[in-house]
From Swiss-Prot:
This is Membrane protein insertase YidC. GO terms for cellular component: plasma membrane. It holds the Pfam family YidC_periplas. InterPro entries: Membr_insert_YidC, Membr_insert_YidC_N, YidC/ALB3/OXA1/COX18, YidC/Oxa/ALB_C, YidC_ALB_C, YidC_periplasmic_sf. One of its GO terms (biological process) is protein insertion into membrane. Required for the insertion and/or proper folding and/or complex formation of integral membrane proteins into the membrane. Involved in integration of membrane proteins that insert both dependently and independently of the Sec translocase complex, as well as at least some lipoproteins. Aids folding of multispanning membrane proteins.
């Protein structure tokens, strides 16, 4: 049996499978490997949602938890906002937040350290309420049969400070309704995307009340602007708890009432994730809360946590503290805010490999100061670590290349007698001490590491807006002049030339086409990823050439 041909066909078949999987995702079909498809993040039509989702008329303001007795009726998300709603804009060194006096909700968040696109002088807009995006952070107070201040209630701003001048910036809003006075205090620190949010709830009535505070993110189901159709990244809801750990939920599952997540917890967080960025509500640790994911309207979803405050006697005040992360997926900073928050950077089943790679990459960047050269250095280190395996692989391939003429002679000698041909081939392999799979197995061991590195480079917000040299001004977008993809195609052709030529003409043609197929795909991939593959291929070529030349010289000496 020609084992090489079988292995090559297996590789080719698997490549076709991957291409088909990407085609399925691109066309809104379920992924073959269980990943979410764009259909799960795409806007749903009103007809489909009305027919399949009974929750499409769910109010934007939650009902009180069952523990507080009968739920109250509250205004829905379509309730008109007061005409005199005021916008309050506050600015720190990293954030510009726009609050609406309606509910003291955050209706726009601009990340001042991140440009909207490569070369843009406009900041990245994460939260917004506009024609192209609905994505807001909201809070409020609810109670059984009561009309407490919610995110649809007019609030008055009671502070004058609008720009950060020291280390902290505080903005405060106040409203009174249903016998409760609610004061919302937002505290922002210099250099931080973590907003501390405090609710002080005072019973100004004559009877005891049982209020609950809710923390809510409201978002449409659309993919972020500029999402690539050539590689998939997750956009949806994430829930974390110590009990169930990190859980991702697609908007499609929420719309179909198929969402699986922890409902009751006293730890963790709830948020919405997209490529490079995230928002998350983090209630105080040890505080019991009810998590709720639901569809408010067609293509409008809410992720919320509800905390019961217990009985509040007349004249008494109770407080609730939480944190709101609104910013980049900065793993180190997020881990300092809450356990598990850094897991929004999700490497899947390769996390055990990817996290050490990211740590090493971060350390290298602290030395080199440039993410492009960091990728080069990291690739060199990985190739050095795997050099013994690569050496064994290349030596095996070099010896296979040397016996290729003898192998062809055996094929001509035995013709269609496959049994005798296989026996003769096995005898030749034993005589020459060649393992036909010796060139493949060492490479298979390295595959998980290289896939993990692929995900690290794809998911790391550090790549966004990071320049390398000359024409590469942003490693997170494609090469504007397609130089790196062209170099990658050239290195793939060189690798094929260094390998033994497949005896089957069809296989040989397939191998020559592969650089065109994969190189063509790289024209649309981030430059950082293509840089990694270019460096990896170049080092592989140098290793293979050096080892092959060494074996050729040794063979010539034995002569």
């Amino acid at each position: 049996m020609d084992i090489r041909r079988t292995v090559l066909w297996m590789i080719f078949s698997f490549s076709l499978l991957l291409l088909w999987n990407n085609w399925q995702i691109h066309n809104g079909q379920p992924a073959l490997f269980g990943g979410p498809s764009p259909e799960q993040n795409a806007p749903a039509t009103a007809n489909n949602q009305a027919a399949t989702n009974p929750a499409s008329n769910t109010p934007a303001v939650p009902n009180a938890p069952a523990a507080t007795s009968a739920p109250s009726s509250v205004p829905g998300s379509t309730a008109p906002a007061p005409a005199q709603a005021q916008e309050v804009v506050i600015t720190t060194d990293v954030l510009r937040l726009t609050f609406s006096s309606t509910g003291a909700q955050i209706i726009r968040a601009e990340l001042l350290k991140y440009p909207a696109t490569a070369g843009s002088d406009q900041p990245m807009v994460l939260l917004d309420r506009s024609a192209g995006l609905t994505y807001t952070a909201q809070t409020g107070v609810i109670g059984a049969g009561q009309n407490f201040p919610t995110h649809l209630t007019p609030f008055a701003v009671t502070t004058n400070e609008r720009e950060l001048t020291g280390d902290k910036l505080v903005v405060r809003f106040e409203a009174e309704s249903g016998g409760l006075r609610v004061i919302k205090t937002f505290t922002l620190d210099r250099g931080s995307y973590d907003v501390h949010v405090r609710h002080d709830v005072t019973n100004v009535g004559t009877a005891a009340q049982h209020p609950s505070v809710y923390l809510q993110l409201e978002r449409d189901g659309n993919d972020p602007a500029g999402t690539s159709s050539f590689y998939h990244t997750f956009t949806g809801v994430a829930v974390y708890s110590e009990q169930d750990k990190f859980q991702k939920v697609t908007f499609s599952d929420i719309a179909k009432n198929k969402a699986s997540y922890i409902k009751q917890a006293d730890n963790g967080w709830i948020g919405i994730v997209q490529h490079y960025f995230a928002t998350a509500w983090v209630p105080k640790e040890g505080t019991p809360r009810t998590n709720d994911l639901l569809q408010l309207q067609p293509n409008l979803f809410a992720a919320r946590a509800i905390e019961a405050l217990g009985e509040v006697a007349p004249g008494a005040t109770v407080s609730s503290d939480a944190q709101l992360w609104v910013g980049p997926q900065d793993q180190q900073a997020m881990a300092a805010v809450a356990p598990g928050l850094e897991l929004v950077v999700d490497y899947g089943w390769l996390t055990i490999i990817a996290k050490p790679l990211f740590t090493l990459m971060t350390w290298l960047h602290s030395l080199l100061g440039n993410w492009g050269w960091t990728i080069v250095a990291l690739t060199v280190i990985i190739k050095a670590v795997f050099y013994p395996l690569a050496s064994a692989s290349y030596r095996s391939m070099a010896r296979m290349k040397q016996v290729a003429p003898r192998l062809q002679a055996l094929k001509e000698k035995y013709g269609d007698d496959r049994q005798k041909l296989n026996q003769a081939m096995m005898e030749m392999y034993r005589t020459e001490k060649i393992n036909p799979l010796g060139g493949c197995l060492p490479m298979v061991v390295q595959i998980p590491v290289f896939i993990a590195l692929y995900w690290v480079l794809l998911a790391s917000v550090e790549m966004r807006g990071a320049p390398w040299i000359l024409w590469i001004h942003d490693l997170s977008v494609r090469d504007p002049y397609f130089i790196l993809p062209a170099v990658m195609m050239a290195t793939m052709f060189l690798q094929i030339k260094l390998n033994p030529t497949p005896p089957d003409p069809v296989q040989a043609k397939v191998m020559m086409v592969m650089p065109l197929v994969f190189g063509g795909m790289m024209f649309f991939f981030p430059a950082g990823l293509v840089l990694y593959w270019c460096v990896n291929n170049t080092l592989s070529i140098l290793q293979q050439w050096s080892i092959t030349r060494s074996i050729t010289r040794q063979t010539a000496k034995r002569g």
